């Protein structure tokens, strides 16, 4: 949770086991009032609604997105619809995974252990599918930050960086520093 009031809501949300209005409010109540943000929403109508709310706020750029297959991340298997909010204006665009690679089902984990293994394989570059999944999402973040408007260029840079194992080396370095 970002907003202090959300800490009281979090346990109830978890007990309910289904999305509530607080799932939509969370990203909008960030007290850091970040100028750039990407917000994934698993429902297209809600994504468009959130984009309209964000357009009323004073943010440099926010991209709200939802995949047509119901994920709150850029999908590796279906079109992702994005609402690019800049200076109160909303521009809609789509990301088609087929423009980057042969589409494949979004990787998932069935346990914390599987998630940890997938994370490690991603950061050390040994699992091409999870690397592509993360790289495609990073490409959107890079676009939001203005690094490049070209998603393909951003994807290639992110994919190359993740595949290199540099992220894994950096994480090991931090872990070793914490243990010393």
Regions of interest found by a model, annotated:
Residues 1-180:
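Glycine-rich anion-binding loops and their surrounding alpha/beta cores
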């Amino acid at each position: 949770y970002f907003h202090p009031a959300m800490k009281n809501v979090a346990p109830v949300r978890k007990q309910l086991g289904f999305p509530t209005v607080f799932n939509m409010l969370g990203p909008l109540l960030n007290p850091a009032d970040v100028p750039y943000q990407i917000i994934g929403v698993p429902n297209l109508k809600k994504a468009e609604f959130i984009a309209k709310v964000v357009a009323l706020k004073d943010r440099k750029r926010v991209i709200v997105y939802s995949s047509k297959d119901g994920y709150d991340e850029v999908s590796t298997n279906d079109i992702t619809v994005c609402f690019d909010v800049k200076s109160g204006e909303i521009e809609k665009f789509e990301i088609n995974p087929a423009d980057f690679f042969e589409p494949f089902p979004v990787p998932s984990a069935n346990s914390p252990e599987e998630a940890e293994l997938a994370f490690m394989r991603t950061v050390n570059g040994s699992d091409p599918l999870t690397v592509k999944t993360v790289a495609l999402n990073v490409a959107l973040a890079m676009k939001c930050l203005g690094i490049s408007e070209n998603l393909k260029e951003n994807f290639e840079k992110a994919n190359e960086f993740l595949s290199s194992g540099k992220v894994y080396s950096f994480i090991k370095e931090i872990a070793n520093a914490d243990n010393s």
